[in-house]
Amino acid sequence: MVHVMVKVKYPPHIQEEFLKFYLSGKAPAYPPYVKRIYQWVYSDYNTKVINIYEIPDDKLIEGMKGIGKRFASYTKFKGHKYKVILMMEGSEAIKLFK
């Protein structure tokens, strides 16, 4: 499995409209093999969300496209930003440096 983190932030003045869209189910669905395993929300001034996904190794490219398509649908909200980050476990990273 591959892990992908998506960091999202948006300003408070769009929160109500953003949440209506988020809860409406109108955003493109994730591919069935993309599993969100964590979602954390916190706030400083902006609302910030951290999502962690699992994607099978052999579906990585298609999974990343699916995640990108979903999050791109939120960019119509002024101030909404997201970043997709491919991650690996520490033990996998150490192997790269041996």
How should these model regions be labeled?
Residues 72-88:
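Conserved short beta-strand edge segments in small beta-sheet-based binding/regulatory domains
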Residues 1-65, 85-98:
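Short S/T/G/P-rich N-terminal loop/turn motif that feeds into the first structured element of a domain
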